[in-house]
Amino acid sequence: MTNLVPVGRALLSVSDKSGLLDLARALAELEVELISTGGTAATLRAAGLKVRDVAEVTGFPEMMDGRVKTLHPMVHGGLLALRDDDEHLVAMAAHGIEPIDLLVVNLYPFEAAVARGASYDDCIENIDIGGPAMIRAAAKNHRFVNVVTDTADYKALLDELRAHDGATTLAFRQKLALTAYSRTAAYDAAVSAWMAGALKSEAPRRRTFAGTLAQTMRYGENPHQKAAFYTDGSHRPGVATAKQWQGKELSYNNINDTDAAFELVAEFDPSEGPACVIVKHANPCGVARGATLAEAYGRAFDCDRVSAFGGIIALNQPLDAATAEKITEIFTEVVIAPGADEEARAIFAAKKNLRLLTTEALPDPLAPGLAFKQVAGGFLVQDRDAGHVDALDLKVVTKRAPSDAELADLLFAWTVAKHVKSNAIVYVKDGATVGVGAGQMSRVDSTRIAARKSQDMAQALGLAQPLTQGSVVASDAFFPFADGLLAAAEAGATAIIQPGGSMRDDEVIAAADEAGLAMVFTGQRHFRH
């Protein structure tokens, strides 16, 4: 095979030392000469391996606290030289440049420094310069050079070398080069994103998003679509950080819905009591607080028992046995919680297809972050919706002010409405949703659909009155006309929370007063598309 290239010399310079010694020993057994830098060389020597310092190769000492060590023609010439170009070979001979056939580099842990909240100066010091330069050089010259940037590829490298008597194929080197360029692109994207945040640059001239492959999937949102899941390095608690205890591999839709459920349940402080969210197609179909987690689940389930079948459940407290027992009474796709006790896990173990995820923590709903949406030819970027209101932010605009009980439910409903696809209408009573209207083009239609579903559920539960009787209503945006408010009143609602800001606010307020409703304005909108 003419594309086989033997490996005779390797340069190793790694921050992550895991697997390093096994790799180096195997390379030594294959009679590969080892060159290394600083701490990597010290680790290899301590293990009894023969290694040349890069300073010996360059004839120049490491300097400036290690900032300058591999940025030298003796290194980059060895990586970039074309082995079949006579001029390159003459230049190498003239300057004593030795070819480097294998580069093993993993970069300074910049992303980890950012994740732990390191200072600005510390983050700057964790930006690798020499590593990316060598990686890009080796990847560019992959016709002749192997470049390994991920410890997960050590085994594949050794398997390749052993299969070809110490050489590698072009196809293998191309695969490594792709991984290498992906790594340097992601690294630069992480630095750029961090600096944009640190310098409070709202709209940098260029924006790059990067991720690390976590999972390939059988298909995407639909069976004809290919899909994969990538983590972004932010370590925000959720699906990306969760431990899966049991069940089948998560699907594209599972991940999308589970994220929606967990972000909503995180809005409810666990120190203020248990809360449960049930989601279907990224929309909540039941949300409730309770004296116990099991009660919270039961109340959320009673909002829409039909839609809850095959849904996603998110809890704001660790799963306990009593709640686990209730959940197993119907088919559920995924349960996500900060934790799960041993007895609860044992109960779930009997349901092999039920996926259980634990995260150890809840995401901070007020934390800054970015959200983006792809459009033809570009993408939209905005701050994550971290909007929040409390009782002091509300403006009473009707003759009647809400009671304390109504006020508590209004704030609960407003929190839920933030996570419902627009146009969103949410009915709440006693700390539980009793009707959710989502995704309608007309706000009055969302109001009526939520009320009708509530009536259907009341009949199924054998109740004489609809669940919305005596409830409060949240609307994610203003009522453009009074019709939506009147539909809510007709369904039995007694109080309304909405942003306000319509040119017909006066008409809507007058209609609320005539119906005896209390209404408050938040001054904040929560469109969700």
Curated annotation (Swiss-Prot):
InterPro entries: AICAR_Tfase_dup_dom_sf, Cytidine_deaminase-like, MGS-like_dom, MGS-like_dom_sf, PurH-like. One of its GO terms (cellular component) is cytosol. It catalyses: (6R)-10-formyltetrahydrofolate + 5-amino-1-(5-phospho-beta-D-ribosyl)imidazole-4-carboxamide = 5-formamido-1-(5-phospho-D-ribosyl)imidazole-4-carboxamide + (6S)-5,6,7,8-tetrahydrofolate; IMP + H2O = 5-formamido-1-(5-phospho-D-ribosyl)imidazole-4-carboxamide. Transmembrane segments: none annotated. One of its GO terms (molecular function) is IMP cyclohydrolase activity. Keywords: Hydrolase, Multifunctional enzyme, Purine biosynthesis, Transferase. Its EC number is 2.1.2.3, 3.5.4.10. GO terms for biological process: 'de novo' IMP biosynthetic process. Pathway: Purine metabolism; IMP biosynthesis via de novo pathway; 5-formamido-1-(5-phospho-D-ribosyl)imidazole-4-carboxamide from 5-amino-1-(5-phospho-D-ribosyl)imidazole-4-carboxamide (10-formyl THF route): step 1/1; Purine metabolism; IMP biosynthesis via de novo pathway; IMP from 5-formamido-1-(5-phospho-D-ribosyl)imidazole-4-carboxamide: step 1/1. Residues 2-149 form the MGS-like domain. SMART domains: AICARFT_IMPCHas, MGS. The IMP cyclohydrolase activity resides in the N-terminal region. Belongs to the PurH family. This is Bifunctional purine biosynthesis protein PurH. It comes from Cereibacter sphaeroides (strain ATCC 17025 / ATH 2.4.3).
